[in-house]
């Protein structure tokens, strides 16, 4: 039985995020979101398992997600946050990795003032600890970070890395370059993977569905071509996806990606793109789906 996996979604409690993202003006997502909100969407889309990803640079928030995952059968993996440059980073990583569903870490690179923060030998100790505990690295980056990410990935060739949201290209402006060239360099490294997620919200959320899909399609095609059928994984980025509600919802984004990827990579690739690749990357236990 093939398990279908959403490789990128969030849960949060607004009351615990005072002064943090998402701001109140984003009323579509400025409220609590938990498993009961996502469950009907998963059922309708026949998604079995999700990867729950942090959205605050906070160990308290990460603990909340780990506790929630322990009580939520549909969560197969948690990507959390640890200060990777802390003096005791190795101990913090070990504590995180002790949780049954802990599978990866994500520094919020897009929000840091230094675009080259990741290209730093002070991360070597943290990366060694991640490798010791078989953790993956989620790269929340934008085009301006890609040179530094390339240097980091070359320095740590044994570390499995996945680029979130295709590195958030400037889809609304129609800029393929220099994003495409930078992504091609990254895709040449075998430890680099990519999430097919978050693109509709980069395409101009107020645009209608036809325009958004037309704007997005060249970027989806590029990612499919660069990372192929084994290193690309679909994710919803829910509930952030709600910001692009003018062009559709959870099932619409899934269907659009299925149609496009079947056209460019072939129907045989869909099991990997929509489940198998994320399962292998995050070492997700699928035993409950095999019963």
Give the ranges of each region predicted by the language model.
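Short catalytic/ligand-binding loop motif for oxyanion handling, primarily in non-cytosolic enzymes
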Residues: 13-14, 59-62, 114-115, 170-172, ...
């Amino acid at each position: 039985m093939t398990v279908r996996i959403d490789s990128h979604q969030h849960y949060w409690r607004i009351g615990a995020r005072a002064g943090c993202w998402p701001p109140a003006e984003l009323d579509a997502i400025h409220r609590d979101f938990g498993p009961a909100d996502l469950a009907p969407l998963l059922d309708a889309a026949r998604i079995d398992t999700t990867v729950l990803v942090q959205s605050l640079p906070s160990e308290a928030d990460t603990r909340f997600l780990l506790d929630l995952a322990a009580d939520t059968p549909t969560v197969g993996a948690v990507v959390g946050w640890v200060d990777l440059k802390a003096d005791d980073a190795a101990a913090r990583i070990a504590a995180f990795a002790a949780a049954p569903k802990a599978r990866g870490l994500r520094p919020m690179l897009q929000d840091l003032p230094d675009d080259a923060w990741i290209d730093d030998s002070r991360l070597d100790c943290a990366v060694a600890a991640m490798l010791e505990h078989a953790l993956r690295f989620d790269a929340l980056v934008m085009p301006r970070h890609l040179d530094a990410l390339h240097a980091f990935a070359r320095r740590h060739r044994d570390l499995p890395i996945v680029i979130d949201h295709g590195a958030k290209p400037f889809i609304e402006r129609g800029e393929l370059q220099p994003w495409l060239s930078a992504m091609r360099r990254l895709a040449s490294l075998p430890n680099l993977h990519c999430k097919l997620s978050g693109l509709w919200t980069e395409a101009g959320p107020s645009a209608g569905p036809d325009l958004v899909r037309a704007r997005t399609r060249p970027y989806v095609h590029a990612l499919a071509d660069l990372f192929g059928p084994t290193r690309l994984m679909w994710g919803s980025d829910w509930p952030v996806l709600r910001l692009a509600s003018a062009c559709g919802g959870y099932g619409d984004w899934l269907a659009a990606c299925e149609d496009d990827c079947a056209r460019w990579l072939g129907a045989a690739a869909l099991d990997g793109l929509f489940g198998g690749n994320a399962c292998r990357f995050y070492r997700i236990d699928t035993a409950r789906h095999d019963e």
